[in-house]
Amino acid sequence: MKKSAFLFSAIALGILLPQGYSYAYLIRYFIMGILFFSLLDLKIDPKSALNPRLGTILAMMLAIAGTTAWVSNWFSSELALVAFVTALAPTAAAAPVMTKFLHGRVEYVMSSVVVTNSFSALALPLVLPLINPGDRVGINALALLNTLTIVLLPLIVTQAMQRWTPRLVTALVPFKGIGFYVWMAAIYLATAKATHFIQAESTSPWSLIVEIAAISLGLCALNFGLGRWLGGQDWGQEMGQSLGQKNTLFSIWVCLTFLTPAIALGPMFYIVFQNLYNSYLLAKGPRSESV
């Protein structure tokens, strides 16, 4: 609950004091730092990475992104982009921590973090031009390199450190909590950037913001609900977190870099909804069903 309070405070600060918007370029490096601390002591298990349930998660991400973008496009192309980018967001680095609190299989969810983040980093710059064939988005090597670097560089560095400097890894593990505060700083910058855009540049009606919030709420309910349903009694918690708790900060960076801050409102609203749901799960307590 305390972490949820920090989250809402960071969002409120970005709305009330948006002057930090000019530093939004730091979000890229903050994401890399968050992933670095999250993956610091990760032991890659090929069996977990090849779990067929991860294939189901990837298939559902694509299916939900494609379907919701298609439906939203009936209303506007802007809403279609919001739906697609939000739905294709990968599993959040915080999902394994949440799964541990809920007494689930942490190894599976951590594998989902690695696999889905790599997948989204590869897929988004390739698919976005098909969804939005405008001037700001294009299939080029630089866009692909930018997204892949954010995910793969922290993974490569942490795995190399485990192999060649294990003592340094052991010394850094107690500081993993720093990643949370880096996340809060990134959320503030993203909110400030979106707020400044709405106040100074956007010509869209306020009704669009309500529609974006509704799409994010619907996607959040669909992802968590579908994940739990697909996982059944045995894997519902793990698949629910893998599909539902998303690395929306990565999607926000994609929006700010390749699209517009208005599109970034989709994953920003999703952050609020997924944290409200996870706060409910924590208050409810670990699952009582047998595993």
Segment roles from a protein language model:
Residues M1-V291:
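Alpha-helical transmembrane segments of multi-pass small-molecule/ion transporters
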